[in-house]
Design a protein with these regions (language model features):
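Membrane/wall-proximal cationic-aromatic binding patches
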Residues: 28-91, 109
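Hydrophobic membrane-insertion alpha-helices, especially the h-region
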Residues: 7-25
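Membrane-embedded segments
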Residues: 73-160
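Positively charged n-region of N-terminal signal peptides that target proteins for export
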Residues: 1-5
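Conserved small/polar residues in nucleotide/adenosyl-binding loops
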Residues: 187-188, 192-193
Length: 194
């Protein structure tokens, strides 16, 4: 039997199996202090929707997180990042948000870090344009909500069950929410506890 034609398949299969057994912790080290420094004012989706950068941010005591919306994108003296940098604050600002981010999106971002928030200081900017009759639109929800943050939020050990239930109930109101069956199950199981 000639193995030569099957050699690429065998090699790729072996490599695949090796990657299956590699510990996930080897890949989370990709977010370094340099990554934090490079992304502290970038306002990218990687920061807004990701969990690894925000996890590393709250492990560090070097940065002061500021959660907000379009006001973080403005290049004027009232931008919190610019204002605090001019004051020579003891910690560098780390901006998290984007235009169209509303209270629910920022609340989910913070809730995904619930177990890391004890003793931490941060700013949560509440924007007047959030207070409308229609609330968060489906379009903004789809563009800015992160499934990885939702998953991390519901895995927070110290978060009270009634708070998880309220988040599940609110997320179920959006037609494009992922894992609706999981959210329904979570809401139902937590209803018995509250």
């Amino acid at each position: 039997m000639k193995l030569k034609p099957f050699l690429p398949i065998i090699i790729s299969g072996v490599i695949f199996i090796i990657f299956l057994f590699l510990p996930a912790s080897w890949f989370t080290g990709l977010v370094t202090n340099k990554t934090l420094a490079d992304n502290r004012i970038s306002l990218t989706d990687q920061v807004l929707k990701g969990t690894l950068i925000q996890n590393k941010l709250f492990e560090s005591n070097k940065y002061y997180p500021i959660y907000g919306s379009s006001e973080l994108e403005k290049d004027d003296p009232f931008n919190p990042g610019i204002a605090l940098n001019k004051q020579n604050a003891s910690k560098e600002t780390f901006l998290i948000g984007a235009g169209g981010s509303t209270d629910l999106i920022n609340a989910v971002e913070l809730a995904a870090q619930y177990d890391n928030l004890k003793g931490k200081k941060f700013t949560f900017i509440i924007s007047p344009q959030w207070f409308t009759n229609h609330g968060l639109t489906n379009q903004n929800f789809d563009a800015r909500m992160s499934q990885s943050q939702i998953n991390q939020m519901f895995n927070q050990k110290d978060m009270p069950a009634n708070l998880k239930k309220r988040y599940a109930q609110r997320l179920l109101q959006f037609p494009h929410a992922h894992n609706k069956s999981y959210l329904c199950l979570l809401y139902t199981s937590l209803s018995g506890l509250a």
